[in-house]
Amino acid sequence: MVDKKSRGHINSDLEFKKKKHAREMKYQVLSFGLMIGLTIVAFLTVATDGVGSWFTIPFIILLAAIQVIFQLYYFMHMNQKGHEAPALFLYSGVFVAFITVLAFVTIIWW
């Protein structure tokens, strides 16, 4: 049998979890809306004839990087505790990819 004190603790714990999930859902919906907006901006940038490719390509890459950050932190839950090891491997991979691209660009354009 559950007494009133433990029942109150269970209810408060349940309320805390509901508020936490509601806050996470709000961030996910906001992030989804921002990603849709960034995608629309990328399409409009390509569709605009007045903007040169020297601006368009780096701008789209920047928008893609921002979307990757939103994907990792809000949809893949990398902002929560317990994801330190996957985050380390992910950031190490990003670092290696950045160095590789930098090396290729340096070799080609130097």
Swiss-Prot record:
Keyword RNA-binding: no
EC number: 7.1.1.9
Record-level Gene Ontology MF annotations: cytochrome-c oxidase activity
Organism, scientific name: Bacillus subtilis (strain 168)
Compartment list: Cell membrane
Main location: membrane
Top EC class for this record: translocase
Positions of transmembrane segments: 27-47, 50-70, 88-108
GO cellular component: plasma membrane
Similarity section: Belongs to the cytochrome c oxidase bacterial subunit 4 family.
Protein name: Cytochrome c oxidase subunit 4B
Keywords: Cell membrane, Membrane, Translocase, Transmembrane, Transmembrane helix
Keyword Membrane belongs to the record: yes
InterPro entries xrefs: Cyt_c_oxidase_su4_bacillaceae (IPR014257), Cyt_c_oxidase_su4_prok (IPR005171)
Catalytic activity: 4 Fe(II)-[cytochrome c] + O2 + 8 H(+)(in) = 4 Fe(III)-[cytochrome c] + 2 H2O + 4 H(+)(out)
Highest taxon listed in the record's lineage: Bacteria
Entry membrane topology: Multi-pass membrane protein
